[in-house]
Amino acid sequence: LDVSVQAQVVNLLGELTEELGLTLLFIAHDLSMVRYISDRMAVMYLGGLVEIGTSSEVFFDPKHPYTQTLIASNPEADPNHERNRQSTTIQGEIPSPVNVPAGCRFANRCPQAMAHCSITTPVLKPVPTTSEDLQSQRLVACHLYD
């Protein structure tokens, strides 16, 4: 969809969720749009959840290295900031989604990987939240938070 039609669809979805009290599962690669339309966000890598939290928390304080890279790769609206921004790329080969490697799915591409990341699969676990919502739960699947 072109940008104007995309914005109209997203605005309509937002209005419908408010007016009708709907819950949506919105799957997208555009994290800015996800942040705009959703209250909570989940980030996946190779079919596995790596981070869950409020959209603001995940977008402004990403915990998982993959989420950090995704957020950093979003283009800046200000052309001066975009021009001066350092390039963000993920090194390494993408593992096969059919033959998922042992341990953390992101380990071979993670700049912060430790030896046990390639052996032990991290599970989603709570990390401190910055949300004022007492019902908010922030979860991250990363050995950095063991």
Q: Can you describe what each PLM-predicted range is?
A:
Residues 54-146:
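Charged, flexible cofactor/metal-binding loops and thiol motifs
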Residues 1-83:
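P-loop NTP-binding/switch modules centered on Walker-like glycine-rich loops
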